[in-house]
């Protein structure tokens, strides 16, 4: 497997941010022993210095991922990330049409991993989870997934106000508008349609932008990650303007 060259979207003496490819793990995990490529190790080799992750992105999600360039910076900045003193913007393609923007305040129970959390308590209280969402574009495709001859999809902008595990995926599923390509919370019929008709084999969730005040310069940092080839060909097919996600 050829080494991946990560796209660096921001770098200074304190931070480096990359556009994480969909399907790539952030760091080594004993749950995925067969994997050989990880963002942390690849980036370390690429820039020739150690990096320290400040937040996480699920394996199937693409987009902005920020690292500190020293453990001292990481320990100073981690609390800011943990307290959500930054604004994250995601884009997703979801089933159905959403007509109006809104804010979903729907608590989520801790989602335990069958293997990693085998001995964790199953009885934890649901945690507050808040997501602002806004529809940006619609499409109706001439393929059936049920009783109707066509199927509708929507391009969404989402800003999580809290950071629960799989929050955006679970919140959109709760609204009955699951994200396309979500194999754990989504709808298999729509995932299959996108695989077969649009050659889309990934979760259509992308971390487009991250904003926060630089803790050492006090300037506002805006880090952006562009969409990949799968997204671009969907925008072409659906006649959507890529400016919507810039």
UniProtKB/Swiss-Prot annotation:
Keywords: Isomerase, tRNA processing
Catalysed reactions, as listed in the record: uridine(65) in tRNA = pseudouridine(65) in tRNA
Any GO BP: tRNA processing
Chain segments annotated as coiled-coil in the UniProt record: none
Disulfide bonds: none
GO terms of molecular function: RNA binding; tRNA pseudouridine(65) synthase activity
Protein's UniProt keywords contain Isomerase: yes
Active-site positions on this chain: 58
EC supergroup of this enzyme: isomerase
A Pfam match: PseudoU_synth_2
The UniProt record lists the keyword Phosphoprotein: no
EC number: 5.4.99.26
Family that this chain belongs to: Belongs to the pseudouridine synthase RluA family.
Function as written in the Swiss-Prot or TrEMBL entry: Responsible for synthesis of pseudouridine from uracil-65 in transfer RNAs.
Full protein name: tRNA pseudouridine synthase C
Organism of origin: Vibrio parahaemolyticus serotype O3:K6 (strain RIMD 2210633)
